[in-house]
Amino acid sequence: MLYFESLKDKFALNEKQLNKFVFYYEFLKQENQKMNLTSIISLSDVCYKHFYDSLILKEIFNFNTVTNLCDVDSGAGFPSFPLKILFPHLKIVIIESSLKKINFLKQLSSHLELDNICFFHQRVEQYDIAKNGSYDCVVARALARLELILKWCVPLVKKKGYFIAMKGKNFQQELEASKKIIKQIRVKLVSAKTLELPMQLGTRTNLLFQNE
């Protein structure tokens, strides 16, 4: 329980939230034996590379100021499911191209008693254009090059809403390559926060953009 206790201390989780993360890990480990959901499956790696990595977004953005969140290509639920556990008021929309991962997340949401989560089985570039401008905040984690995810994701964001791109340590190169699209779609980089995961498990940079 050491890794879970460190999450509890870092993010001020209550016992109910902590128990949800414990179940999340056990269910992920169980279902991953049946289908390939993630290559990251050890307890320490899941706690820090998945849970911690998702929850740390609260340091770059105040999720209490928004009501809905769109997670693009969520995979096994990161970062939206950890954020939903921490911020239960959020209405979550997940766009995911893998049907098996959607089915996993539907089961998980039922087990964790997480409500107000909608799932769309499709690629983000094929997502219903009528829903453009629908979301207070959109987030994408390890989806594609920054210039591509800006092109795909920012149109989903409301005017004056926010987009969070979760990137690695080489974000500066991607940011430089994205100057043209940033100007074209009229989005502003508000903040860039680089952090080291615990136990030297990697470097992350979270980029916060505002749709102008």
UniProtKB/Swiss-Prot annotation:
Q: Which GO terms describe its cellular component?
A: cytosol
Q: What is its main location?
A: cytoplasm
Q: Which SUPFAM superfamilies match?
A: S-adenosyl-L-methionine-dependent methyltransferases
Q: Where does S-adenosyl-L-methionine bind?
A: 78, 96-98, 124-125, 141
**Which family is annotated?**
Belongs to the methyltransferase superfamily. RNA methyltransferase RsmG family.
What role is this protein assigned? Specifically methylates the N7 position of a guanine in 16S rRNA.
Q: What is this protein called?
A: Ribosomal RNA small subunit methyltransferase G
Q: Which organism is it from?
A: Onion yellows phytoplasma (strain OY-M)
